[in-house]
Amino acid sequence: MEKTIAAISTAPAPGGIGMVRISGKGAFAVADRVFRGVSGRAVSQMKGYTAQLGGAFTPAGERLDDVVALVYRSPKSYTGEDVVELSCHGGLYVTKRLLQLVLDAGASPAGPGEFTRRAFLNGKVDLAQAEAVMGVIGASGEQALKAAQAGSSGVLSKKIQAIKAQLLVQASHLAAWADFPEEDVPAVEEQGLLSAIRAGEESLARLLAGFERGRMYREGLSTVIAGRPNAGKSTLMNLLSGCERSIVTQYAGTTRDVVEETVLLAGVPLRLADTAGIRDTDDPVESIGVQAAKRRLESAQLVLAVFDSSQSLEKEDWELMDTLQGVPAVAIVNKTDLPTQMDVGEIQRRFEKTVFLSASTGEGLEELEQELSEILDTKEFHPEEGVLFTQRQRADAQMALDSLREGEQAMALGMTLDAVTVCVEDALNALSALTGEQVSEEIVDRVFEEFCVGK
């Protein structure tokens, strides 16, 4: 980490401010070659956590833009190194020009996630906290943001360390008993060992149980809006998305391609897919859309099944109800602003949740959100308590849990404590891998290659 790195840390789009971040031993020297403050003080003379207004200049003395320089001195910075942040007006061109001036002054381009990688290598964050940073950046809802913030502040890491602390006490007793059998070493208290193993199992099982729910808030649910033609699927899509995403006409078969949009409903990002009305058709183009709708239904995590209450149930409605048996689905009895002609009781018998709604007026939308909250069990999610964020974390936690269960089974079978020791040590190694205390460089590379440049 000898080289000084730099990158644009704001979004690659026009905005109020553009910012170039510089980190490394030469950060102040690089900034001094680019920045001139109105006070006459060089960046290298500024105290940590101070800012100064000035300008960015080319080597020929040409002024690029007004710039604010913000200084962080090692080790009290995000990366643990000397850091300078140069903020200019947020045009794409001027921000790129500012970065080029910094690179010409001696900095090297930062790779994806290299600032956070340096924070990890310098002990400012562990690997689980680093992964949560990407969760903060990518959060699409309140619960996902809370979970990511808890992770980046170390809540998950503290839970893992608490499990490790209990197991380390037992591991040290086991090691002393195994290494010094002829010394006056107290015998291993097996009940205490078993209690520690079971406590670790319980904590890990809770974390693993929350993984899928946490992923639901982070990644959203693949949600299909299905129904026969003219049931009001596209009108519902437009209502939920808050804009005219789908074409709406009185003619059946208007929607042919799958129209997609992500919306936040009941606190959960729903990746909506408005599909073609499912029916038998001789139109070859519409038929392709119908087949696409059926494929989407097969892989959907949630289905919003739309029925037109102003008409009697038809063949396509019955077929849809049969198709959705055992599938997480909410029945939406649509067009409640019109006289009802449908046998609503039949739908209520077929679906666990039924919502009466008018997609054209919006009446019933709150009820839909309430029913989704119940079916998705959103009240049972407590992100502030710590959540496993990635498949890597999940795999390490599962490995630790499996090892502890094997240790408990070894004790139940009356196997020697040597066998139990191996299981406890395997669990500790898996937990250390989760937080990054014992992890290969290949794993570290894989984690940070998912990051954006500038973070």
Residue ranges with predicted function:
Residues S108, P269-R271, K353:
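Conserved beta-strand segments of alpha/beta enzyme cores
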Residues C88-G90, L240, T275, F307-S310:
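Glycine-rich, N-terminal phosphate-binding loop of Rossmann-like dinucleotide-binding domains
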Residues E286-S310:
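Inter-motif core of Ras-like GTPase G domains
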Residues M1-K146, A150, G154, V330:
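A glycine-rich (often HGG/GG-containing) alpha/beta subdomain
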Residues Q52-R73, G253-T281, S299-L302, V306:
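Switch I (G2) and immediately adjacent beta-strands of P-loop GTPase domains
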Residues E2-I8, P12, E142-L264, T281-D283, ...:
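C-terminal-of-GTPase-core extension/linker across diverse P-loop GTPases
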Residues G15-I17, Y49-Q52, S299-V303, G326-A329, ...:
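Short glycine-/polar-rich loops that comprise or flank the Walker A/P-loop
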